[in-house]
């Protein structure tokens, strides 16, 4: 009662067994987990148009609001943001196996990079400071791993131990977050360790590109923030 938007889980399921595909699959599963937890805690709401239901009246309200005017993509996210800010307790993100949808990961690194740049660029238009703070925190954490690695290579000794301990801690936290959700979603967490290393590099890279390279390619057209 009073629900105007229902967010369903969307998972990436790729063909083959590539490291890039495994990393995208785990990354997207992680985003779904964080988004589900955040919605239950009322921190922020996030979802994908690939598995989203909403009432007709709230959709027309959203169109009239021009909430995402002049933003190239992300109407699904901005619709959720608009509804959650206007109507209290109106967005639901249930943990339900019966409303899971599936999508394909990007086939190559260039396509993947452009997709993530597009997502990162639209985040600058979010009006909810909680979600901005969350993504900024994740980026800073991953940057700290790169800095720690550089210090370990240059100085050795204690820095190597600190880096190894921090990295081991990250792997443990990520594994115990993804493993139960992988079982719930009936998705394996293949190549977890390699994908987790890859994930650190990609998060840092995308963050820098979002700040300093504001252009991206989408549907064979080039856009700029």
Regions found by a protein language model. Give the residues of each.
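Short, P/G- and charge-enriched loop/turn segments at secondary-structure junctions
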Residues: 37-43
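Short secondary-structure boundary/capping segments
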Residues: 43-44, 91-92, 208, 215
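Catalytic donor/gating beta->alpha subdomain of glycosyltransferases that bind UDP-sugars
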Residues: 3-32, 60, 66-131
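Short linear elements at protein peripheries
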Residues: 48-50, 218-225
